[in-house]
Amino acid sequence: MSEELSKKHTTRLNKLQKRLRREVGSAIADYNMIEDGDKIMCCLSGGKDSYAMLDILMNLQQRAPIQFEIIAVNLDQKQPGFPEHVLPAYLDKLNVPYHILEKDTYSIVKDKIPEGKTTCSLCSRLRRGTLYGFAQRIGATKIALGHHRDDIIETLFLNMFFGGKMKAMPPKLLSDDGANVVIRPLAYCREKDLEEYANLREFPIIPCNLCGSQENLKRAAVKDMLNQWDRQYPGRIETIFTAMQNTAPSQGVDREQFDFVSLTRDPNAPMRGDVAEANLPAFDFLDIANSGRIDLDAAKRIDIVNTYEV
C-alpha cells in the first residue's frame, strides 16, 4: 500500500471509528445498557458485526467514567469446516478474557429440519439457550449481541408482513425468565458502516453459511426492499427508525396498548377551536381583487350557517 493510500485508509478508519463510537455511546446512554460494575458477556460469532461490537466496547471501556468487565464468548456449534483456531488466535492478541463453548447444535438442527429448509430459526434458538445459561454460570450481568439498526428495522417489517405484529428487536431486553438482560450496543449503527469498518480493521471474518443453509428468503426480500428505498429516497430508513422511537398508542388501533373502551368526553371542558371562534367575523368572504385576502369589512357575523330539517 502506497503512503498516500495508507494515509487515506487511516483517515477514513479514524472518522468511521469516531462515528461508530459516538453511536454506540449514545445507545448505551439512552437505554442505560451498561452500568458501573457490570460484567458484559460479549457474544462473538466471527462475523463483522460482533467483531466491531467487541472492538468498540473495548475502546469505550478505556474512556468510560465507569468500570465494567468484558468477557468474549463464542459458541462452536460444530458446523462443518468451522475454523476453530481463528477466534482464539484473535482474542489472544487482544488480551481479553474469553471462553470458547462447544455444543453440537448442528447435528440437532440437521436432524430436525428437512433438507433444503432454512435452519437459521432453530439454530439461533438453540444458540440463545446455551448462551443464556452460560451467562448465568459466569455471573454476567448483561449479554451483548451484535444486532445493528438494519437488523432492527428488517425485523419490524418481517413481523408486520409475515407475523401480523408491530414488533422489532429492542435495544435492551429482559429475558422471559427474568434471569438475563440482553443489550444491543450497535442499535444506532448502520450495517454498511460496520461492513466498511470490518474491512478497514481487517477482522478475520468467519463465513456464516458453513452449515449450508440458505439465507432466510423473507429477510432477504425485506433487506432488498429497504435497500431500494434507501437508494430512491435517501433518509427514509433514518425516518423509519426515528418513527419507531416515537410511537403514539392513542393514535393506533392496538387495544392492549391503549384503553379505547373507557374513553369519555368531558362535558365541562373549555370551548376551543371552531366553537370558541363562533363569534368572530366569518372568514368565508375573500376579496378576489386583493389576491384572495380576507375582507373583514365585508364579512358579517353568522348566526346560523345552515339549517337542516330532517
Curated annotation (Swiss-Prot):
GO terms for molecular function: 4 iron, 4 sulfur cluster binding; ATP binding; magnesium ion binding; sulfurtransferase activity; tRNA binding. It catalyses: cytidine(32) in tRNA + S-sulfanyl-L-cysteinyl-[cysteine desulfurase] + AH2 + ATP = 2-thiocytidine(32) in tRNA + L-cysteinyl-[cysteine desulfurase] + A + AMP + diphosphate + H(+). Its main location: cytoplasm. A motif (PP-loop motif) lies at residues 45-50. It is found in: Cytoplasm. PANTHER family: AMINOTRAN_5 DOMAIN-CONTAINING PROTEIN, SULFURTRANSFERASE-RELATED. This is tRNA-cytidine(32) 2-sulfurtransferase. It comes from Shewanella baltica (strain OS185).
